[in-house]
């Protein structure tokens, strides 16, 4: 019989670190660990040696930063995708790309199974497995966290200690942290009580607003067809733009989010996020759309933004619906070109100005000075026709 070969999505965190040994022992299989680089800063050093020492027979480190920015983040930004009007979907956006990378390696290595380290009540299990089903439906999927004997992160840490598996989580600091260039999610520990304010040690990159500089930072961001192309007049690649805005935003306490969100499985969970660049760029992009999009397009696109956010959050990135919405979004973004000037100060983002060659703002129509060119007399007829339906209704059904 062919020996089983399992490709696992390997982050180097607590769950996936102990998962290598657990799977190897349970299935007597060869383990191929696959790490996708989405711009995370922590737990990426010595991953190969750590995976091999833990029992993996192979390791792949896949640089996904460029496609993550250009094919995922920018699409979500153009769509205005914020889950439940708050979360910029950093973790959710990365999952389909990580799952695709895992499938690609599994096919290359002739693996017979795919494995992930997602919990049985979280969102990521759905995102990974729906992507697997879309891209490689013939491969068997394993989800150890849904079946193994460990009932808490503390028991997982005990297993790691027993088998000399190095992990960064400790019983004193038990946070579960997921990081990529678009944002960081932090959960577990005291954060599970929604009445407990996040301890300062939970935050990974941002300065607290109280300790942020007393002098504001002014930043100018230029967009072309909805995509950021420069910061403070300097043209940059997308990755560099996000890095720069993460740096400026983190220094000024921007991007701390504390929300109760509705998970895919129906559970409400308390999530802490840090997303400086995402917060800044979504704000700037929306303000530029206010200036350049026709009224009905701007208002209708708000509905599309929620639909798009739900597609990302619910794990159906590789779907015809997302592709169809991309076509709509891309068409709306043709005039979203221009510059937005912002002030970053102690946790807040304030608009200072915006301009665009496609601006629909007409000062001669908007002004109340002598330069006013609006025909005020035309308003009477407009109002009469606009309200005619309600007037007719009220004549038949008078108010009581």
Curated annotation (Swiss-Prot):
Tree of life domain: Bacteria
**Which GO cellular component terms are attached?**
cytoplasm
Cross-referenced Pfam families, in alphabetical order?
Answer: Arginosuc_syn_C, Arginosuc_synth
Q: Where in the cell is it found?
A: Cytoplasm
Family matches, as PROSITE patterns: ARGININOSUCCIN_SYN_1, ARGININOSUCCIN_SYN_2
Catalysed transformations (reactions):
L-citrulline + L-aspartate + ATP = 2-(N(omega)-L-arginino)succinate + AMP + diphosphate + H(+)
Q: Name one GO molecular function term.
A: argininosuccinate synthase activity
Q: Which GO terms describe its biological process?
A: argininosuccinate metabolic process; L-arginine biosynthetic process; urea cycle
Enzyme Commission number: 6.3.4.5
Q: Know the name of this protein? A: Argininosuccinate synthase
InterPro entries, per the entry: Arginosuc_syn_C, Arginosuc_syn_N, Arginosuc_synth, Arginosuc_synth_CS, Arginosuc_synth_type_1_subfam, AS_cat/multimer_dom_body, Rossmann-like_a/b/a_fold
In the record, the note on similarity to other proteins reads: Belongs to the argininosuccinate synthase family. Type 1 subfamily.
Q: Which SUPFAM superfamilies match?
A: Adenine nucleotide alpha hydrolases-like, Argininosuccinate synthetase, C-terminal domain
Q: Which residues bind ATP?
A: 9-17, 117
Write down the species.
Answer: Chlorobium luteolum (strain DSM 273 / BCRC 81028 / 2530) (Pelodictyon luteolum)
Enumerate the residues binding L-citrulline: 87, 123, 127, 176, 185, 261, 273
Positions that bind L-aspartate: 119, 123-124
């Amino acid at each position: 019989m062919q020996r089983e070969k399992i490709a696992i999505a390997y982050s180097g965190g607590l769950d996936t670190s102990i998962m290598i040994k657990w799977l190897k022992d349970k299935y007597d299989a060869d383990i191929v660990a696959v790490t996708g680089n989405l711009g995370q800063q922590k737990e990426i050093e010595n991953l190969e040696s750590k995976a091999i020492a833990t029992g993996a027979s192979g390791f792949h480190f896949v640089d996904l930063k460029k496609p993550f920015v250009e094919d995922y983040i920018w699409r979500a930004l153009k769509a205005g995708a914020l889950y439940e009007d708050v979360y910029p979907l950093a973790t959710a956006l990365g999952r389909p790309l990580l799952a695709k990378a895992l499938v690609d390696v599994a096919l290359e290595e002739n693996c017979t199974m795919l494995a992930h380290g997602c919990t049985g009540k979280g969102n990521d299990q759905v995102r990974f497995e729906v992507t697997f089903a879309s891209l490689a439906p013939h491969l068997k999927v394993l989800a150890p966290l849904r079946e193994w004997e460990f009932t808490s992160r503390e028991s997982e840490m005990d297993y790691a200690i027993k088998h000399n598996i190095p992990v960064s989580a400790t019983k004193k600091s038990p946070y579960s942290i997921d990081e990529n260039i678009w944002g960081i999610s932090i959960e577990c520990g005291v954060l599970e009580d929604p009445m407990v304010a996040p301890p300062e040690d939970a935050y990974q990159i941002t300065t607290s607003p109280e300790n942020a500089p007393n002098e504001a930072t002014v930043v100018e961001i230029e967009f072309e067809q909805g995509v950021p192309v420069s910061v403070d007049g300097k043209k940059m690649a997308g990755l560099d733009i996000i890095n720069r805005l993460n740096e400026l935003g983190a220094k000024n306490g921007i991007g701390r989010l504390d929300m109760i969100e509705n998970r895919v499985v129906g559970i409400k969970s308390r999530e802490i996020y840090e997303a400086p660049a995402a917060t800044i760029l979504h704000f700037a992009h929306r303000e530029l759309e206010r200036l350049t999009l026709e009224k009905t397009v701007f208002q209708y696109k708000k509905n599309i933004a929620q639909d798009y956010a739900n597609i990302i959050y619910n794990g159906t990135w590789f779907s015809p619906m997302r592709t169809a919405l991309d076509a709509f979004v891309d068409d709306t973004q043709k005039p979203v070109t221009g510059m937005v000037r912002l002030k970053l100060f102690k946790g807040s983002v304030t608009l200072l100005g915006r301009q665009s060659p496609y601006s629909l703002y007409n000062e001669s129509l908007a002004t109340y000075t002598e330069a006013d060119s609006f025909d005020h007399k035309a308003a009477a007829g407009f109002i009469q026709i606009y309200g005619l339906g309600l007037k007719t209704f009220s004549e038949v059904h008078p108010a009581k």
